[in-house]
UniProtKB/Swiss-Prot annotation:
Protein name: Mating pheromone 4
Signal sequence region: 1-16
GO CC annotation terms, alphabetical: extracellular region
Membrane-crossing segments per the record: none
Recorded name of the encoding gene: PHR4
Pfam families cross-referenced by the UniProt entry: Euplotes_phero (PF05842)
Location in the cell: Secreted
Keywords of the record: Pheromone, Secreted, Signal
Annotated source species: Euplotoides octocarinatus (Freshwater ciliate)
Amino acid sequence: MKAIFIILAILMVTQAFKMTSKVKSMNMSRNMSKNTSTLGTKYTYGCPQTNTPTQQDCYDAMYYTFMAMCDLYPDPEHPMFPSYDSCQEESDSADEFYTNQCGCGGYGMAAAHDQVCLLALGVCIPE
């Protein structure tokens, strides 16, 4: 699972470089976390933008990460588009990432992962 998350991150960064011509102008906070990126989307990808995140900060960061993926890969047929299956498969990896990289330990990120992912998918899947 960890390998899938790492490969996903590498592919997202690679895609971001390819999309530099499509990057929209944004106002970015100067105190963004080192584990945060915009990847050319209107959504922030990665950790909460605070050194001491609350549970809601962590859930919001996870939600915006899924929305960034939907923004980067709007075609549901694209292999990188988040899916219902990936929501359930990546819970442990997400918990490990948000706990170890973002300071979200103790907030039940694995349990929240499926709900937050499905909530984001409900917004980004075209009808």
